Amino acid sequence: MSFFSKSIRAVSDIIDEAVRNVRGRISSDVSFSEYVNEIEKEAHRLYLLEEKRVVREILLKEINPESRLKDTLQKVADIVVELSTVIANTRRSRGGMSSEYILSYALKEYGIDNEPVGRRRSKKSYYPDVAIPSKEALEKNPNGVIALAVKRTLRERWREDIPIFRHFPNAAFVCLSDSADITEGKLLDMQEEGLRVLFLPDNLYFSLKGFIEEDIKRIEVYELSYLPRWIRAKLSLLR
């Protein structure tokens, strides 16, 4: 059902609306981490509303109101089965894009020029999710930019982003959602896999701070609210 994926609003449009809604209800002194999480939660809420709207349109389009109840129920069941896979695939593909766009929007709000790259991968190359200051700068001089890999949670395939630290000397892995399933064991796995710089939502970082200081020696781990300052410090060294 290509109609479903084509009918859902673009990720950028949903996040635009989420940002406007969040701006109108949060205080000006909110932390960067909380700001990002508020946008992420609002974007998720809006996306679910989009799903419901499109599913309703499909049902109204496909169901004949004159049909017998038995036939109608069978038709609904067939549509639901088909849609379940389509919805899951659409969520997966758009979820990755939404994370990078949310972070990009938030960084721009903090005065940091950046650009979502649009993930491209092959066996021979790796591209990050967000380039600072731009994709053009990334293409021209990979050593002179900051490259960010972005994940909403760590249930996602974080190992696929380890190459960012081989391709870009100024790189970081950023986890956005404060509902991320980060554990001590996962941090140890990341350390063994070669992850070098990690930003975690503030509440998760501080809940694990003791373990991080004691056992995580080969990863620079920071709270998410520190990211804008970290970027500015890196940029000052690159100029």
What does each model-found stretch correspond to?
Residues A180-R239:
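Domain-level recognition of nuclease-like catalytic cores that cleave nucleotide substrates
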